[in-house]
Amino acid sequence: MALSSWSPELGLGSEKALPVAAVSTGPSLELCTFPSTLGSSVATDALEQLLVVEQSLQSDYFKCNEEAKNFLKDVAIAVKKLEEMRKSTIDLLEIESMELSRLYFVLETLPTSVSRELEECVRDARRVNLVEMSELHTKITRINDEIEFLKKKILHLQTDNTALGERQEELAKHYGKIVLSVNHAMKEKATTTIYINETYTKINLEKKELELQKTYIQEIEEQIERERAEYLKKKEKLNQEIEEYKKLCELKRKETYAKKKELDKLRLTMTKMRETVTTSTVVLSDHNLELARLQESIREWEHKIEDMKKSCKILEDKMLFFKNNREKLDDSSNFEKSELLLKIKQMTEKLHNCRLENKALREKLHTVSRQYKIVLNEEDKVFMQKRKIYSENQKQLAFIAQKENFLSKRKVDIKNMEEGLITLGELHRATKEVYRKQIKILNENMERETQRCIITQWKIACLRKKHARWVKKIKDEIKELIDKIQEAENRRSELIEETSIREHDINEFLAKIEQLTLELKQEEDAFVIKERKLIQELSKFEQRFAEEAQISKEKEVELDKCLPQLQVAEEEFTDKNRKFQNLIETVTAQKNEQNLLNNNISQFTRDFIRYINNTKKVKQELKQLREHESYKTKAHFEILKSLENEIYLHDLKTDALILENKRLKEYIAYLKDNIEQYERGGEDLVRSSSDLSCQLTDLQTQYSDLWAEFWTTLKKRRKRVLLK
């Protein structure tokens, strides 16, 4: 008996002839030993190649699709499992060889009848082993073919990966350029918006400054009016004082005339006294006593006169103090007038400069608005170009994905065709049950595909309904957006009208301010002329008063020279009495004037306090009004900003909705194409199933014929064996 031994290269599908291992029943029993490196060289090479591929997959330089990576990883795992299976089969074969050697030893000790039966069993087992070996050989060849196909597929995927990597780099460069252009455009837009905001803030600040200047001008006008009123009051007081001084001068003239008359009378009395002196020498003693008494009374009167002089000096000092204060007040009023005039001039210059700056800023705003419109148009163009590029990129990616799916389907179809050819080659040796199972599987696949087609049609109908609802919703939202935009435009037009009305009011107010400044200048010129005239008149009156005082002094000197000592004493006594009376009258008049001045000062302080309080109230009200106006302007500006942002967001939403509508349309067209392809595939499958059923009937007849021949040959061989 001879049994074929296990070849070491059987598991790898080699085309060499299988060596025969002799199994003898004699004493020289050969053990079936197997080498430890059964098919290890090719397996190790494959594993090394797969390890290299795995390392390249794990590295960042290698670029490939995730499907290809997963496929290669699965292949590596399958090869590792095959290597483990190979080692396990080697171990099992060694165990079986040991058992066979033990059985051969047992066979030597058994009788001949039993050995024959065992030989027949071994023959049958050998035949079964040969059939299994042939099946394993076919499987190994199939695995080798699959490995070669996988290698080819790996090479093809590598080429695709390189092409896709280059395409990806090109797309990345193009995308980087687009991103840089977009960033540059956004940067320019940001700079323009910042410049516009700065100009807007400058305009607001200048408006606030103009309002402050207007308020200051109003305050200054009010101060000027008040100062005018005060000046008129002072002027009236001065006129009254001048009239009083004139009256005093007239009274003094009358007094001087009376004094002259008295002097004449005294001269007459002097002559009479000289005449009487001669007659009154006898009565000198009596007169001496009277003179002593008179001297004592004169001393007393001198003390009183000194006290009166002191009081007069005090009153004169007070008068000088009041005069100095009056001069200081006049100087301060003149200084304040000059300062106010300078301020008014500065304010007029500032107003002129502000107008020029306002004109320049308006021109800048006009240019900036033009630039902003140009930038917006450029941004719209760039955005449209981006959309076109993005749509083209998506179309290209979809086209590439479709091509990849088509290629994968074609590869799968080629695989299936190859497997079908192999199965057709093996169908000669297969049974009817296999054909029936395949037919059942095909029927089940057909039913599944029909069910899938029905499900896809149902999904398409649902999607159409959803799309119709979505279109209705979008139309309603677009209508609402149009209404909101119209409302925003109406608000914007109203705000523009309000701004135009306010600008008109501001221009009218500026014209009024200019008219008031001109009127103030004219009134100030007239006031200055009147002041000069009054000063000239006062200087004339002072000169007259000084001349009359000099004349009176000269006359008094002449009187002093003429009168003797006794008469001088009497005259001084009389003069001092009169002066005393005059001083009392002047003191009373000055006290009255002092009281009037105190009352006027108190009234002036009260008026000044009221003026300060009123100015504070006016300033507070102006601050409140400014804050209210600034708040209104800010609120209007924020409303405009929010409306612009809402319009921009609605534009973006509409663009996104349009893009989604386009994508849905493309996806629906893609689904329609897939449905048509599935329908065509179903028709092709029906045709192929009909062809396969015909081939199955033919092969079934061939198989029945071959099976009959096989049984006839078996029967003939059994008969021959029995005959032998």
UniProtKB/Swiss-Prot annotation:
The keyword Magnesium belongs to this UniProt entry's keyword annotation: no
Membrane-traversing stretches: none
Entry keyword set: Coiled coil
Coiled-coil intervals: 131-164, 203-256, 282-373, 426-534, 565-627
InterPro entries: CCDC175
Protein name according to UniProt: Coiled-coil domain-containing protein 175
Organism field: Bos taurus
